């Protein structure tokens, strides 16, 4: 065998090994993200049961999520700084283990005096030491032409994990409360325990794993060039594209937040669905995530992520507008269908809006910091929306409260479409220049 043939075989083997490594790392990130976040977002399936189990009302539930949102906003910028300096695997291991321990405390249903503390600390363990390390690690694994695919596979893949865990949890919850005659509180505790032990088991797995030797291309991408923090912040804040991206994520996150109240809307919005039936529909909605996330990502790589994102923003906004009027026709099937459709579009949005970071001219060495800057503003709805949702549904009981809340969400969806169109126009001008 001649020298050229040998080199060709070595190159092919190296590329195959690099691809196996990158997709293996992606799979681990997917499992971690799909397990850690549902712990504190069980309201999207069990909101009414949560209120009964914890002995609180809608407004108090809003305070809990607002406290967690405050922790998120405080965490995002330092999270980006940490992601630029510490190994992601260690940060992710800590996050999983700490979140699992918090979930065990949460499962004791300690009362409203302690619940805000649990939710605030949950915001730190899933925000400060997890969020930016997750996204920076993912961006470094994906080639330039794979950004949409990798981010879509992250969101879609974690959707498979979330939906699988949610289906198992719902089966246990229904069996214990319907067949075994246990209370809603006991059934809800069982659900929390499932997520708690899953997080702890994953933390042990990540702790035992050893970081494999990275291919040269990946190592080069991940190299950190230390710079002045204030200078880096000044540089990033002067990028118009980064601010437009922030607006897009901010508005898109409003659309996603609307899905958290779908279970309560189906149950309390005059449609007459039971807690189990509403939970079944919203669990089915979770299964839209792999289709929306992965499908949107693959389509984004073919057409550009931003174009697909614009279409998804428009359709999700129209879907929520349709949900506002669905109760006028008392259409259970229509409302359930809209919930699934909105879920599909919203998950496509989530799978794509971080992929557009690639067109914002952000250097690799400050990617984590850029993610932190965008996240601080774009995820601030974590503070405001729980309060808005809690106040409107508490002061305007039934369908009216949800119509007011969803009308605000639709307005934000329209603004998101406008921001995306402006960014698309700027990119087109830059390419034409």
Q: What residue spans do the PLM features occupy?
A:
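Flexible cytoplasmic inter-helical loops of multi-pass small-molecule transporters
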Residues: 5, 210-231, 432-433
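Extracytoplasmic gate region of multi-pass secondary transporters
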Residues: 43-47, 166, 239-293, 350, ...
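Helix-to-loop junctions at the C-terminal end of transmembrane segments
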Residues: 75-87, 292-305, 393-394
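Cytoplasmic membrane-interface "Motif A"-like loop-to-helix N-cap segments
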Residues: 85-96, 301-315
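Cytoplasmic helix-loop-helix junction between adjacent transmembrane helices
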Residues: 118-157
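Glycine-rich segments within core transmembrane alpha-helices of 12-TM secondary carriers
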Residues: 148-174, 375-386
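C-terminal membrane-cytosol helix-exit motif in multi-pass small-molecule transporters
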Residues: 170, 174, 196-219, 419-424
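C-terminal transmembrane helical hairpin of 12-TM major facilitator-type secondary transporters
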Residues: 304-356
